[in-house]
């Protein structure tokens, strides 16, 4: 279920929103990214692992980070440049780590895992596109905001689902297959998605 509900909301859709709509589009995409990230790292974790303790919820790095950012924002605190640079470099260093983990697991993914991956990947992409259109229709969104929602909702299965599955040993090969297939499908679908968004939701 987490694979269907939690798409890739960071390293793929954010650059796409920047490409399609510029800095304003990227700014609109960030709140969506934060909400999905918090949900994925807490409720998504519980869906895959089967449980989530309240202590794990409140002390999860993403929850602490969002809370700290919110406090800084509302209080207008000035964060020292040294701290900003340190956290930025640590963040850049962490980007390839999930990809290395998935690459390590690739030899263990069988044809059966890929078949399951195809089914769930198609379900995620269809579910994401339809849910995005429903949100746009229900909320009456137009223009850039509608386009950003459509891009964010139509993304493939997030790699984090595989990381959680590998950590808790809950069908990691099946979930790895889902992540791989849905991500490869987006290589073909991204140009079509960007074209559709710019055509359907002109700024």
Question: Predicted segment positions?
Answer:
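Alpha-helical transmembrane segments of multi-pass small-molecule/ion transporters
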Residues: 1-203
């Amino acid at each position: 279920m987490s694979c269907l509900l939690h798409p890739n909301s960071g390293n793929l859709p954010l650059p796409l929103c920047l490409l399609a709509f510029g800095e304003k589009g990227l700014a609109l995409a960030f709140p969506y990214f934060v909400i999905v990230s918090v949900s994925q790292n807490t409720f998504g974790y519980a869906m895959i692992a089967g449980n989530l303790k309240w202590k794990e919820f409140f002390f999860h790095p993403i929850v602490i980070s969002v809370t700290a950012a919110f406090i800084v924002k509302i209080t207008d605190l000035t964060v020292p440049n040294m701290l900003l640079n340190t956290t930025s470099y640590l963040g850049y260093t962490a980007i390839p780590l999930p990809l290395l983990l998935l690459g390590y697991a690739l030899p263990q993914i069988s044809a059966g895992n890929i078949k399951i991956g195809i089914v769930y990947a198609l379900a995620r992409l269809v579910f994401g596109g339809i849910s995005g259109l429903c949100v746009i229709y229900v909320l009456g969104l137009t223009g850039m905001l509608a386009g950003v929602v459509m891009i964010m909702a139509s993304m493939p299965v997030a790699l984090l689902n595989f990381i959680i599955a590998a950590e808790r040993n809950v069908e990691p090969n099946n979930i790895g297959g889902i992540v791989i297939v849905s991500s490869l499908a987006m290589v073909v679908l991204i140009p079509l998605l960007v074209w559709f968004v710019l055509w359907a939701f002109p700024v």
